[in-house]
Amino acid sequence: DVSVDEVLDELLPDLMDIYEGKKIHLVRTKETEPFVIRCNLSLAQILVSNLVKNSLVHNREGGELHIATTPSSLTIMNSGEHPLDGEKLFRRFYRSIDGKKDSTGLGLAIARSIALSASLSLTYKWQEGMHLFLLVKESQKKS
């Protein structure tokens, strides 16, 4: 079992340093109980890292990045210009219309594959000017 909170605590300082030039404002919230998933540690690190990197790469300068964990979920929200195609977003090599040159289009496809192998659901939605990625345990998934 892997604590997503611990993975985030290790990854966030380095990732925020790498993207500090974008002046992204990070808001991190967590509950007393961590979000623990049944997954190989290396795969959990790749899953979380790909989601956070995606939210940094595709954020605007001076944008927001909200990362929240509960005992049953991880929510990552970042500033955006417009909604993305939720059907195509998790496909390999998918790039949005304004796709970034430094994006391979693989990160979210890999994240979704790891999530599925760990009985997790990874979904996307557009909410109030923010891209929202939600990772939940399949047993906790709400319709």
Task: Please tell me what each predicted stretch does.
Residues 1-16:
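A conserved beta-strand-to-alpha-helix junction within the catalytic ATP-binding
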Residues 101-110:
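Glycine-rich phosphate-binding loop
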Residues 54-56:
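Short helix-loop "hinge" at the ATP-lid/N-box region of the Bergerat-fold HATPase_c
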Residues 82-94:
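Short conserved segment of the HATPase_c
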Residues 62-73:
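Short beta-strand/loop element within the Bergerat-fold HATPase_c
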Residues 118-127:
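Glycine-rich ATP-binding loops of the HATPase_c
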Residues 36-39:
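Conserved micro-motifs of the catalytic ATP-binding
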